[in-house]
Amino acid sequence: MGAHGVKAVFFDLDNTLVDTAAAGRRAIEEVLPLSPPGPAAAVISVLQSKHHYGEGEARVICDKVQAKLLKECHDPAKMCITDLRISHWEEAIQETIGGEVNRNLAAECYFLWKTTRLQHLTLAEDTRGMLTELRKRVRLLLLTNGDKQTQREKIEACACQPYFDAIVVGGEQKEEKPAPSIFHYCCDLLGVQPAECVMVGDSLDTDIQGGLNAGLKATVWLNKAMTTPVDTSPVPHYIISSVLDLPAVLQKMEHKINANLGTDHMASSNE
């Protein structure tokens, strides 16, 4: 793209490039005896034989852990992510079954959930193809919030490193999205200006608001369900239902830029 166009695209990771939510659901199902045998078959067998969980109890535990993950607030200065998430399982089991706290079982559940989730985190072939083609024209950067260990493990699991010029994890920075500082840090990494960058992500509160806060050229909201945001939500420049729609959006932006340049040139020659 031209000097006045897009030089870099920043991508969110979770539920933008990889379906973390689906991987998490699959993993949480495999921890307890609710699904057909898979990578977790051995641990499921132990849970069934040693602890005699019924399906109803297992479902309640799963639901409680899922709710705790959704509301999770992690301060790495106070507790490591591993201890926090083992505590989620510990609390869910305690709240459902009662009796003495079983830290060992909670840890077993957590590590099985974590391992299984990572196994199900994949960068789809068509997404890899899109990134490969885009990188021939613009610089690409992966910008993800979250605990540094957790996010680096996800990045490794989905093997997305070769598709990006740089990768930035919020947990390794002073501030995360939507703070302007992390976006400006990304710009400096790539040697570009905010007005030459586009942010793509599924979160209005972090990806879109952050891109707006940092003065990026454009923000692209991935709205897979095509839901209607509340009136107070930040307004993205573009909305797509699939990340694969992004090249068409970038092409539309380029046409608009070229049209504006043509208009400016005509006005200048008529002066």
Residue ranges and their predicted role:
Residues 1-62:
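Active-site neighborhood of HAD-like aspartate-dependent phosphohydrolases
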Residues 45, 49, 60-112:
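A metal-dependent, Asp-based hydrolase signature
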Residues 112-120:
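Surface-exposed cleft-lining segments at the edges of enzyme active sites
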Residues 1-9, 37-38, 53, 104, ...:
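Asp-based, Mg2+/Mn2+-dependent phosphohydrolase catalytic module
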Residues 119-128:
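Active-site periphery "cap/insert" segments of enzyme catalytic domains
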